[in-house]
């Protein structure tokens, strides 16, 4: 019986365990974490056995490190001192890859212990073992730093989309589309809070657009500190690049160059619409925005048209916003469902669908 050790039984580690169990019910899942977390995981059928780090590592055929980056680095050093099975496969789930992969390559002889960096690009506003979700990674990208069929097979029950990406390129790409936006979100919150000291209405008028832009500012501060410090060069490069872009648009505004300003927004709109937005580090789905009249029963009418679809979330935006796409927001897990739902609503109603 193949033994899989998962170190870290939070949302990611526990959800991976459930996915492995779905595809490989004959595998034994060992779990290492704090005693109370292990107890919960075992009672909920997420793991089969509770083990200490040393005991589990020496028994395991595959080890998954589902812990923060700084802890992953410490654990790799600890594992390198243990008597591990020859041919052991180790992988991680960290949001950056270069520092982790470089350390693993220094510590382990590939003929004895193999290391494949991993990054499941999905998450939730919930956390901890109680939030474990067998479908968390469905249709989400799962990055591997090199091809490995054994790991693909192990994780096939996650129903994720595996892509192979060099560690350095992974950090460049995620630095732009994941790490840097978290800096922007928190910076905008800081700026607005400072501005509100002289203009207190800021906090009352900050509605839809501000809320959407700054949602990720509520992410785990310790985790994101660890992420940024693990990817400093790319992060600083993206900050400097953004400063230049802000300076350029500021100059256009100062020069009252309306054509250039309009082009700035129009081009941004086109680029955004052309992007295929998938699940990222936090929940992100395929969203349909519908402008509906403020009438009784209209939401039920729309949902009735979509009764055969798997809908992830329905949100009614109550405030009137000058920048909103539609008062009703419906989220799907699959792009195909969004496309079909759009066609159904457009045929059955005169509502504007975006």
Swiss-Prot record:
Coiled coil: none annotated. Keywords: Amino-acid biosynthesis, Aromatic amino acid biosynthesis, NAD, Oxidoreductase, Tyrosine biosynthesis. Residues 287-354 form the ACT domain. Pathway: Amino-acid biosynthesis; L-tyrosine biosynthesis; (4-hydroxyphenyl)pyruvate from prephenate (NAD(+) route): step 1/1. InterPro entries: 6-PGluconate_DH-like_C_sf, ACT_dom, NAD(P)-bd_dom_sf, PDH_C, PDH_N, Preph/Arog_dehydrog, Prephen_DH. It holds the Pfam family PDH_C. One of its GO terms (biological process) is tyrosine biosynthetic process. It catalyses: prephenate + NAD(+) = 3-(4-hydroxyphenyl)pyruvate + CO2 + NADH. It comes from the Bacteria. Its EC number is 1.3.1.12. GO terms for molecular function: NAD+ binding; prephenate dehydrogenase (NAD+) activity; prephenate dehydrogenase (NADP+) activity. Residues 2-283 form the Prephenate/arogenate dehydrogenase domain. It is an enzyme of class 1 (oxidoreductase). Belongs to the prephenate/arogenate dehydrogenase family. NCBIfam families: PRK06545.1-3 (NF005105), PRK06545.1-5 (NF005107). This is Prephenate dehydrogenase. It comes from Lactococcus lactis subsp. lactis (strain IL1403) (Streptococcus lactis). The gene is tyrA.
């Amino acid at each position: 019986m193949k033994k899989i050790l998962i170190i870290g039984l939070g949302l990611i580690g526990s959800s991976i365990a459930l996915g492995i169990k779905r595809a490989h019910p004959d595998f034994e899942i060992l779990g290492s974490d704090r005693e109370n977390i292990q107890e919960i995981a075992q009672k909920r059928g997420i793991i089969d056995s509770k083990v200490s780090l040393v005991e589990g590592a020496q028994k395991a055929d595959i080890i998954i490190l589902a812990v923060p980056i700084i802890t992953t680095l410490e654990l790799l050093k600890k594992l390198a001192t243990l008597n591990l099975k020859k041919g052991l496969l180790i992988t991680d789930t960290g949001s950056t890859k270069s520092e982790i992969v470089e350390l693993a390559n220094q510590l382990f002889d590939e003929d004895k212990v193999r290391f494949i960096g991993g990054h499941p690009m999905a998450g939730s506003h919930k956390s901890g073992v109680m939030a474990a979700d067998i479908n968390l990674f469905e249709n989400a990208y799962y990055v591997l730093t090199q091809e490995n069929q054994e790991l693909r097979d192990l994780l096939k029950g996650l129903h994720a989309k595996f892509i192979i990406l060099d560690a350095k390129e992974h950090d460049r790409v995620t630095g732009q589309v994941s790490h840097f936006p978290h800096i922007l979100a928190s910076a905008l919150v800081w700026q607005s809070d400072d501005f509100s000291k002289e203009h207190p209405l800021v906090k009352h008028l900050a509605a839809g657009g501000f809320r959407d832009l700054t949602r990720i500012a509520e992410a785990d501060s310790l985790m994101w500190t660890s992420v940024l410090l693990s990817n400093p060069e790319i992060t600083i490069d993206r900050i400097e690049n953004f400063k230049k872009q802000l300076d350029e648009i500021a100059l256009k505004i100062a020069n009252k160059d309306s054509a250039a300003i309009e082009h700035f927004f129009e081009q941004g709109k086109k680029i955004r619409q052309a992007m295929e937005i998938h699940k990222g580090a936090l929940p992100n789905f395929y969203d349909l925005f519908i402008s509906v009249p403020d009438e009784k029963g209209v939401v039920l009418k729309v949902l009735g048209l979509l009764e055969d679809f798997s809908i992830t979330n329905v949100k009614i935006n109550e405030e009137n916003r000058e920048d909103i796409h539609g008062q009703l927001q419906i989220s799907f897990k699959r792009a195909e469902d969004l496309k079909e739902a759009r066609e159904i609503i457009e045929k059955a109603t005169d509502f504007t669908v975006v």
